[in-house]
């Protein structure tokens, strides 16, 4: 490869690395917003729900908090260990989402809207975390 070609490749690689870092920062901000939205939706659901649905909402809030902590740690220090913790937190979000979905049909009509909102927020959060994992 000629010297000019090598320089061009180096410049493009440097530009892509800079874009990637900025994209990762934006992705982190998007994940934080999704975490806040999910937390708000789950708090609303927990305030309206009773029995097993309230318990499932509490599990989901715990899972969202775990995901927040794992996401922060992963952004600060993207190691194999923090990546695994983030993957575990995503799997837990998957589990609590399924738990909430199973309760949807039996949920009182007045709570279904909050439950749908919580499920939508959890889905968005799970997608953001997956993008964070895929982008790093």
List each model region and its residues.
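Surface-exposed, polar/charged faces of alpha-helical domains
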Residues: 33-40, 44-136
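Bacterial signal peptide processing site
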Residues: 18-23
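Bacterial N-terminal signal peptides that target proteins for export
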Residues: 1-8
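Bacterial N-terminal signal peptides
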Residues: 8-15
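Long, low-complexity interaction regions most often at the N-terminus
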Residues: 1, 15-17
